[in-house]
Amino acid sequence: MSLHPEIAAVTDRIIERSKPGRAAYRALMTQQREGGVGRPRLGCANLAHAYAGTDEQRDAMKDGRRMNIGIVTAYNDMLSAHAPYYRYPEQMKVWALEAGATAQVAGGVPAMCDGVTQGYAGMELSLFSRDTIALSTAIALSHNVFEGAALLGICDKIVPGLLMGALRFGHLPMVLIPGGPMRTGIANSAKARVRELYAEGKASRDELLDSEIAAYHGKGTCTFYGTANSNQMMVEAMGLHMPGAAFINPGTKLRQELTKAAVQRLPEIGWNGDDYRPIGEIVDERAIVNAAAVLLATGGSTNHLIHLPAIARSAGIIIDWEDFDRLSRAVPLLARVYPNGSADVNGFEDAGGPTFVIRELLRGGLMHGDTLTISGDSLAAYGQHPALEDEKLVWCDHAEASGDDTILRTIDAPFSEEGGFRILSGNLGRACIKVSAVERDRWTIEAPCRVFSDQHAVHDAFTAGELDRDIVVVVRFQGPRANGMPELHKLTPPLGVLQNKGFRVALLTDGRMSGASGKVPAAIHLSPEAIGGGPIGKLRDGDIVRLCAEEGILQALVDPVEWDARELAPAPPPELGTGRELFAMMHQADEAEKGASAMLAAAGL
């Protein structure tokens, strides 16, 4: 089918805006490519150091004619999603040798779990761990002894950080290799209900802990459709996975065969062959639009309104929130996965999963089908699902209908004609809102505000019964330059309790919410942020705030003369400890719409 005119128009807008940056990026990648393979140009002592830690691969490496794959791993066993990676490098080295290549662990990158740090000091390091991961990826690949790379990462900041670093080595072919979601525990809705009961004082700490352990019970990605699983959806659409690899459970034969296929695909797309597919050419403007389209079609995480612009900038591409807003009005909502529905990602995969969504969007002309991928010269392969036949990996066509139309639908009968995001603007600045999980009658909230500068103060006010009314809860000084833009997901249960009581409730913040957040309308990522002089700093308790996702309005209903005359509230002193003082570079970060990166800002990218 021909490309939808709005998809084409947004893509053209991005291409035009990105011309200088993209041209400079491609020129740099061409320069690196034309410099030739690194190993033949290294000194013998340098090479000896590179090979010293190897055993059975040393002779093959010394030969110099095989691709040497650099494995960049985000393994740790504190993060359940990454725990399966423990044995991956050993297996990958064997599979590489079978394919006539070699492989080494080039380096490790940090991988923090937002689920562990949520609501605590460590969360203030979360967003800027992404820059650290990008820098660590660059260090790993800087040894110049690799002709390709395999990136092992899944979770919130890890995939964006890996991509940001990897794209500065855009002349190399690369694959991302996921680990898959843990199997389903208790229902996410049941978990959320216990959290609300605990917030109301109706469930004990032991009951809450038992519920959480029943939900997060094993190795693999958390099963809700938050940022980690949105990452996987995005990477599929960009053509950087083996098709359909995203949501196959760990420890299965199919998972193993997909990982093997990814490793053995790299030598086939290397720069010394006839099918050279460098990551810098795969990730172009069309791939970025495709990533945005699948996120919108599935109600993906709001964090990608920050991450995707940062990834794009690393490849010389500029995408802004207006692009997301325009795409959201063209792309229908095809999936309802918790927190946008009741099913988890395992149910989503059983109903058809990412490959069904991609097939449908291609069928409707809502994605670019002619993009370069690691698999082929079009995205069509990503509309087929992987399977095993006689123990061999194959890809099969989907049935015409979804396996469960309460979870996943075709473009002919979507859950909504539009996607899940909206941009809001007015005298408070510019913010975004995820509406895919918000009931339509709550798309507009107009109520007095209560202003906080700390999320813990919100909890205290809730416990004291001070928020039991129609209210817009304002939490400011939470932006990237203030304190690292922590997620405020811990506010979801108390705000949900207020909403359940019948009050009309909304959140307004220059910070972030988790990709797991849902039913309470939240205007987030507000720019400019309070510490940068943003007008959110003018709000006072009792001001009427109007948030309207229907009309794209975010307005303080204050007399204009009074509003202009108001002074900004002073910023609270920065919190120290837990290593936060080492991340002072956050104070030089770009605004959220540009990706909220201090690293990219300093690099002039």
Task: List each language-model region with its residue ranges.
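Catalytic or ion-coupling anion/metal-binding cores of large enzyme and transporter domains
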Residues: 1-77, 81, 90-107, 120-122, ...
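Glycine-/small-residue-enriched capping loops at alpha/beta junctions
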Residues: 84
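N-terminal small/polar loop signature for handling phosphorylated ligands or for N-terminal nucleophile
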Residues: 106-144
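Contiguous domain-boundary segments centered on the initiation and propagation of an alpha-helix
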Residues: 130-137, 144-149, 459-467
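A short, small-residue-rich loop immediately preceding and capping a beta-strand
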Residues: 137, 141-162, 175-178
